[in-house]
């Protein structure tokens, strides 16, 4: 059998191999949505990824002989650790063949790099914080993921768990069928809230003042999510970069702000689920100088019949005011008018029991679970752990 090695990414060719690794390993999986290669290169570029203005990443490739069999990114996020008083390192962009030795070597390489920065645990997957794509799919592998949600083969959770990782948090996706008019319970709750608080108004995001509107959403997001597990505030640069990324797919009727006496107190953001259109592009907008992928994506986007409700946030002092039913009722009505058959609500923290009760009362059903794992670095880097020969060195850097 060919020798298994893990090495850090240093050259342009290695960076290309790192990006292409996921496409090579998952191209036969019909449920995988190939991200645009342009976006994947930008994710690793300090000029295009605001996270890298304060965070650090180290990329690793696993080879068996000359064949790339896996990859991982070690992620150091000083803002997260300052916010939580922790010493957590992270891993992301994990992709690996079903090879336990390769996975173990990748995790040990990432862990060793983070240990050099005084981190004590390895948490993930996150790309590169909880504000972005995160979690390992642990069920429903036969269904494609929604827009901006991850997908992985069934082997991934096994590879992670067999390296000593344990679950630290689950993130759930729920499905909400779109029907003519909001569900009766939601309709009654929204009507009661409107009667009780006549000063609540729900409006669409004004795209002509997009930057100012996104600044309002950012403030609401930070206030509403500040006590959530894993939350870390986004910098102004990060949020504006995300807002620019979302702008081309934003539908104003599904992007809502709730105000009380003219002051924003809540928001909800629902996007068309363009994952099927992205699959048609195959990871490239252009081939041989011709916009074939773009044309296929635009054609498929006209057939979209699902959306993803990706965020709802309410400032604490208005959580009992009935503003959430008003936002959801407006969203349900707009989604039905757009011809949507269902919305995926994702993700919802596994410890958010009040949200579970609300979703069940609306007739939603839980569809997918994404898991965040954690491992102590002392256990991961234990010299007595068999299998990879990394007892004397963090990784083979040849």
Annotate each predicted stretch with a short phrase.
Residues 82-164, 169, 285-361:
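Acyl-donor binding region in acyl/amide transferases
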Residues 174-190, 371-398:
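C-terminal "cap" of GNAT-fold acetyltransferases
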Residues 4, 150-230:
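Acyltransferase donor/substrate-recognition loop-hinge adjacent to the catalytic core
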Residues 26-46, 226-242, 272, 282-283:
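Conserved GNAT-fold acetyl-CoA-binding loop/helix
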Residues 218-272:
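Phosphate-binding active sites in nucleotide-utilizing proteins
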Residues 233, 259-260, 268-274, 311-316, ...:
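Active-site proximal loops enriched in glycine and acidic residues that flank catalytic Cys/His/Asp
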Residues 4-53:
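Hydrophobic alpha-helical membrane-insertion signals
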Residues 36-149, 249, 259-277, 298-304, ...:
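Conserved donor-binding loop and adjoining core beta-sheet/short helix segment
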């Amino acid at each position: 059998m060919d020798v298994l090695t893990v090495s850090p990414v240093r050259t342009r060719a290695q960076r290309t191999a790192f990006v292409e690794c996921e496409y090579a390993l998952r191209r036969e999986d019909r449920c995988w949505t190939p991200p645009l290669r342009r976006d994947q290169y930008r994710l690793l570029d300090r000029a295009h990824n605001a996270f890298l203005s304060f965070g650090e990443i180290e990329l690793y490739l696993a080879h068996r002989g000359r064949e790339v069999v896996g990859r991982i990114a070690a992620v150091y996020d000083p803002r997260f650790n300052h916010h939580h008083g922790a010493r957590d390192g992270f891993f992301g962009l994990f992709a690996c063949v079903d090879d336990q030795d390769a996975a173990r070597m990748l995790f040990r390489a990432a862990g060793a790099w983070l240990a050099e920065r005084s981190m004590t645990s390895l948490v993930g997957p996150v790309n590169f914080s909880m504000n972005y794509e995160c979690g390992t799919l642990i069920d429903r592998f036969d269904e494609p993921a929604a827009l901006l949600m991850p997908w992985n083969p069934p082997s991934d959770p096994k590879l992670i768990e067999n390296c000593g990782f344990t679950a630290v948090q689950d993130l759930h996706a729920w499905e909400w069928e779109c029907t003519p008019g909001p569900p009766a319970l939601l309709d009654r709750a929204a009507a009661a809230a409107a009667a009780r608080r006549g000063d609540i108004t729900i409006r669409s995001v004004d795209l002509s003042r997009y930057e100012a509107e996104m600044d309002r959403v950012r403030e609401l997001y930070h206030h509403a999510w500040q006590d959530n597990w894993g939350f870390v505030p986004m910098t102004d640069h990060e949020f504006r970069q995300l807002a620019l990324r979302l702008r081309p797919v934003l539908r104003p009727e599904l992007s809502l702000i709730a105000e009380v006496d003219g002051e924003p107190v809540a928001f909800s953001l629902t996007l068309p689920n363009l994952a099927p259109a992205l699959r048609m592009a195959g990871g490239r907008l252009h081939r041989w100088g011709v916009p074939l992928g773009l044309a296929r994506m635009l054609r498929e986007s006209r057939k979209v019949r699902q959306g993803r409700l990706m965020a709802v946030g309410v400032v604490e002092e208005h959580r009992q005011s009935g503003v959430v039913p008003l936002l959801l009722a407006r969203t349900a009505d707009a989604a039905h008018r757009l011809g949507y058959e269902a919305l995926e609500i994702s993700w919802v923290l596994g410890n958010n029991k009040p949200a579970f009760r609300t979703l069940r009362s609306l007739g939603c059903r839980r569809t997918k679970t994404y898991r965040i794992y954690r491992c102590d670095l002392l256990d991961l880097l234990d010299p007595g752990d068999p299998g990879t020969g990394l007892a004397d060195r963090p990784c083979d850097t040849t």
